[in-house]
Amino acid sequence: MLINIQKMEVFKTTIEGCIVLSPTLFSDDRGHFLESYKKTLIDDFLGYEVEFVQDNESFSSKGVLRGLHFQKGVYAQAKLVRVVQGAVLDVAVDLRQDSSTYGQHFSIELSSENKKQLFIPRGFAHGFVVLSDSAIFSYKCDNYYHKASESGIIYNDPTLNIDWKLPDDQLQLSKKDLELPGFKSLKL
C-alpha cells in the first residue's frame, strides 16, 4: 500500500507496524534537498504518537553486521533508521508474542542513493549489514539506551533464516554479537 503524503511516500510492509518512508528529493544546480523527518506525518500514518528522544550514528566498513539488538520491557525502543552514506541491508524481527507475524522478519536495502527509511516499532529486534565499502547509519530512538535491558539474537539463527546478502566469511561481528542466544531460547 502506497500513500503519498506531501513530500514523502509511506509504505506499509508485510509486518504490521513497520513502515518504509521514501522522501521526495528536490534537486537543482546547487545540489538537493529532502525532508527526512516530519513528526506529524509519522504520527498520523501510525495512528499514535512517537516521541524520539535520542539520535545515534555509526560508521562501519563493508561486511560489518550489527545486531540483532533490542531492549526489553519498558525500555523497548521504536526506531527510525536511515543511511546517510553508503548502503546497508536493514532487518527487523517481530518479537511481539501477540502478533500474527511473531518471529517473522522484514529486510530492505537502505542507501544514500534511494534515501529510504524504515520505522521499526517497539517489540522488534533490529540489525543491519554494510553492503557498500563503508556506511554511515543514522537512527532515532523513542527511548534511551538502558544497558541492563539490552538483549539480542544471533544473526544466523536457523529459525529466522535471514539472508544477509553476504557470505559468512565476509561478515564482521563484535564478540558480544557472536555470543547472542538463538531465537528459541529468548526470554522476553
Question: Which sequence ranges carry the predicted segments?
Answer:
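Short beta-strand His + acidic residue motifs that chelate non-heme Fe in jelly-roll/DSBH
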Residues: 118, 126-131
